[in-house]
From Swiss-Prot:
GO molecular function: DNA-binding transcription factor activity; sequence-specific double-stranded DNA binding
Biased composition range(s): Basic residues: 35-55
Annotated Gene Ontology cellular component terms: host cell nucleus
Organism: Avian sarcoma virus (strain 31)
Swiss-Prot/TrEMBL GO biological process terms: regulation of transcription by RNA polymerase II
Comment field (misc): This protein is synthesized as a Gag-Qin polyprotein.
Region (Disordered): 28-80, 101-143
Entry's localization field: Host nucleus
Protein name (database record): Transforming protein Qin
Organism domain of life: Viruses
Residue ranges of the annotated DNA-binding region, renumbered to this chain: 142-233
Keywords: DNA-binding, Host nucleus, Oncogene
Length: 387
């Protein structure tokens, strides 16, 4: 009987152990283990035989651990994300793998991009500035092709009163030519030198009633035939034929308008405008020059007394408001200084070709006054020629 029981026990135990280890969880295995131990306690002989043919119970946890390892192997592998430091290290390794040539190429690409950005910004700035000035290139303004004399003449001719102070000339040039806003010291000195040396520019003293400082600069009337050359942009003088036509037109204009003296009481200097019509309100007749030369002074004409024309008789006698007359002038009753002033004023108010009899022995020829170039020359004793 014992042999049969042993054989049956041997046949059954491997099946139970195999099914428990592979199909049942650990908790069920522990329960089964407790039940199996209880069964072995009832059959000590069988327990002895089981202990002889099967491994001890402590081997079961090892089998459970092996099963857990198998489950872990079957599960998908989940790797943690790489750290930032690892990424940088990988990039550095990649660059190192490229070698020095790769690094140099990358630097060149960066430089080209930066240069293109700068160029685009510069072009945008230039477009904005070109709409305003249109002369700026490479960050600097182009120098205008005009000479300093031409710039001065443009400034004076475009002024309303045909005269400007030195500062007024500077302001005109800087306003119309942005190139001269820089390096003021150099070109301003050149402007002063050209004003002093060129005979086309005449200095006019400022009237004492005129506030401000600095003298005025005007164009000499003889410079009317001066123009700015189109090729050299320098001052040029018209040909003789052109000057004759200009003088003829000027003489016709003066004849039609008429020139006489105007009262300006209390004035010591009289800056005359070239196109100012001089007419005395109390003159009984209008006297004008019949010549074709310039009949107006560009310099201020000093005089100490105001001349008024009371009447023009058949004997062509002129008198002044303060009692000055040609007779007194010739007879020496007037001081020498007043003699020059009065003679010049009287001669300027008499048309050319008209002789003024003086005490029956002398005649006054007004054409001896040199007004052709705008220079006022006064009478000397040689201006009085005996008849």
């Amino acid at each position: 009987m014992l042999d049969m029981g042993d054989r049956k026990e041997v046949k059954m135990l491997p099946k139970s152990s195999f099914s428990i280890n592979n199909l049942v969880p650990e908790a069920v295995q522990s329960d089964n283990h407790s039940g199996h131990s209880h069964h072995n306690s009832h059959h000590p002989h069988h327990h002895h035989h089981h202990h002889h043919h099967h491994p001890p119970p402590p081997q079961q946890p090892q089998r459970a651990a092996a099963a857990e390892e198998e489950d872990e192997e079957k599960a998908p592998l989940l790797l943690p994300p790489p750290a930032a430091g690892a990424l940088e290290a990988a990039k550095a390794e990649a660059l190192a793998g490229k070698g020095e040539a790769g690094a140099a190429a990358a630097e060149l690409e960066e430089k080209e991009k930066a240069a293109e950005e700068k160029k685009g910004a510069a072009e945008g700035g230039k477009d904005g500035e070109s709409g305003k000035e249109g002369e700026k290139k490479n960050g600097k303004y182009e120098k205008p092709p005009f000479s300093y004399n031409a710039l001065i003449m443009m400034a004076i001719r475009q002024s309303p009163e045909k005269r400007l102070t030195l500062n007024g000339i500077y302001e005109f040039i800087m306003k119309n030519f942005p190139y001269y806003r820089e390096n003021k010291q150099g070109w301003q000195n050149s402007i002063r030198h050209n004003l002093s040396l060129n005979k086309c520019f005449v200095k006019v003293p400022r009237h004492y009633d005129d506030p401000g400082k600095g003298n005025y600069w005007m164009l000499d009337p003889s410079s009317d035939d001066v123009f700015i050359g189109g090729t050299t942009d320098k001052l040029r003088r018209r040909s003789t034929t052109s000057r004759a036509k200009l003088a003829f037109k000027r003489g016709a204009r003066l004849t039609s308008t008429g020139l006489t003296f105007m009262d300006r009481a209390g004035s010591l200097y009289w800056p005359m405008s070239p196109f100012l019509s001089l007419h005395h309100p109390r003159a009984s007749s209008t006297l004008s020059y019949n010549g074709t030369a310039s009949a107006y002074p560009s310099h201020p004409m000093p005089y100490s007394s105001v001349l008024t024309q009371n009447s023009l008789g058949n004997n062509h006698s002129f008198s002044t408001s303060n009692g000055l007359s040609v007779d007194r002038l010739v007879n020496g009753e007037i001081p020498y200084a007043t003699h020059h002033l009065t003679a010049a004023a009287l001669a300027a108010s008499v048309p050319c070709g008209l002789s003024v009899p003086c005490s029956g022995t002398y005649s006054l020829n007004p054409c001896s006054v040199n007004l052709l170039a705008g220079q006022t020359s006064y009478f000397s004793p040689t201006s009085l020629t005996p008849q």
